[in-house]
Amino acid sequence: MSAIVDIFAREILDSRGNPTVECDVLLESGVMGRAAVPSGASTGQKEALELRDGDKSRYSGKGVLKAVEHVNNQIAQALIGIDANEQSYIDQIMIELDGTENKGNLGANATLAVSMAVARAAAEDSGLPLYRYLGGAGPMSLPVPMMNVINGGEHANNSLNIQEFMIMPVGAKSFREALRCGAEIFHALKKLCDSKGFPTTVGDEGGFAPNLNSHKEALQLMVEAAEAAGYKAGEDVLFALDCASSEFYKDGKYHLEAEGRSYTNAEFAEYLEGLVNEFPIISIEDGMDENDWEGWKLLTEKLGKKVQLVGDDLFVTNPKILAEGIEKGVANALLVKVNQIGTLSETLKAVDLAKCNRYASVMSHRSGETEDSTIADLAVATNCMQIKTGSLSRSDRMAKYNQLLRIEEELAEAAYYPGKAAFYQLGK
């Protein structure tokens, strides 16, 4: 009764008003699974291909009708009749049907939409929530959120090069408390920005985008906002950065417009170390350019015992590239973005590889999101203990947080919130 009888995709819009792919998978039992695919702004060179139409007469060339057609024709023909519980087999069929390393024929937005919709349909058919279907029985951790409260880089029109300044409520006793902590700091930050004459418009991920003079000024604002909300930075909340360094790495140097300076990789590692010494920063994502392996090695040697160093553009959720990074001893955590690799099975393989090598995993959204909340279930199913899904505004971000609230409620005593234990790889 769990055989696939129909697969249908459509073009919908994401949180930036750009087209993306949504897919429905119908099973013989009458159950349907639906999933929608996110899209990134700052993307890694080795990410799986997001197939766009290129027709400038529609959505400035960003339409996804080709990807939709691939789902409704080649993929549907290959998968109809197969048991939806055979997730790995289904994903492998799509990988072979595409025939490229980067999903360049079918498009990762086509394969991922189907992969996630199949999992949702199979979970529904089994009478299980998605996190239980994928994660099995037993206790599960709710993730510590990385809440993006100040935006820079490609996510905002300001002078800050570092793309995301985030708070992590590690002192909370539950996810519900952590969410309240983040929301209260977010609103305190808004009042603080107002009082200083900064605009309170928000960036793609819901954080504020004030035109500050330096990265230190952004971090100091976060300290003040935490205190104004009744929390202590360094105890109740820790900070996290997403440098997205590939966006300002040119000609072998890191160019910081906000600072008016350029740095070699060794100098930029020292710059980041200076921020860590001055502020309670526990996590730095993409602290070096994705191709600057020497810089990553320097940064890992300098900070890898006390700070989580997350590879996003560096690893692009690709098990092969992650394995290379593990072998070279760079970074100590993996950012997990399902659309970087294009299937659920490959995503889970990357998370498993990270765990086996004591690399932490951070489940992540993209800057272009939808109301789809699959990553919330994935964060719990994989027990990855961290999630990055934006600020405390915009319903596309809140959809994930609200789903985590529901999951915590459903799990009750079987749920736990790890707090600082989420950074288990540090000090190893």
Curated annotation (Swiss-Prot):
Pathway in which the depicted protein is active: Carbohydrate degradation; glycolysis; pyruvate from D-glyceraldehyde 3-phosphate: step 4/5
SMART domains: Enolase_C (SM01192), Enolase_N (SM01193)
Residues holding (2R)-2-phosphoglycerate: 163, 337, 366-367, 388
GO MF, one example: magnesium ion binding
Binding residues annotated for Mg(2+), in chain numbering: 242, 285, 312
Primary subcellular site in the record, as a coarse category: cytoplasm
Reaction(s) the record says it catalyses: (2R)-2-phosphoglycerate = phosphoenolpyruvate + H2O
InterPro entries assigned: Enolase, Enolase-like_C_sf, Enolase-like_N, Enolase_C, Enolase_CS, Enolase_N
Keyword Metal-binding: yes
SUPFAM superfamilies assigned to the protein according to its UniProt record, in alphabetical order: Enolase C-terminal domain-like (SSF51604), Enolase N-terminal domain-like (SSF54826)
Transmembrane regions: none
PROSITE patterns reported for this sequence: ENOLASE
Disulfide cysteine pairs (residue numbers): none
A GO cellular component entry from the record: cell surface
Superkingdom: Bacteria
Alphabetical keyword list: Cytoplasm, Glycolysis, Lyase, Magnesium, Metal-binding, Secreted
Active site as annotated: 205, 337
Protein family (similarity comment): Belongs to the enolase family.
Function: Catalyzes the reversible conversion of 2-phosphoglycerate (2-PG) into phosphoenolpyruvate (PEP). It is essential for the degradation of carbohydrates via glycolysis.
Protein name (database record): Enolase
Natural source organism: Neisseria gonorrhoeae (strain ATCC 700825 / FA 1090)
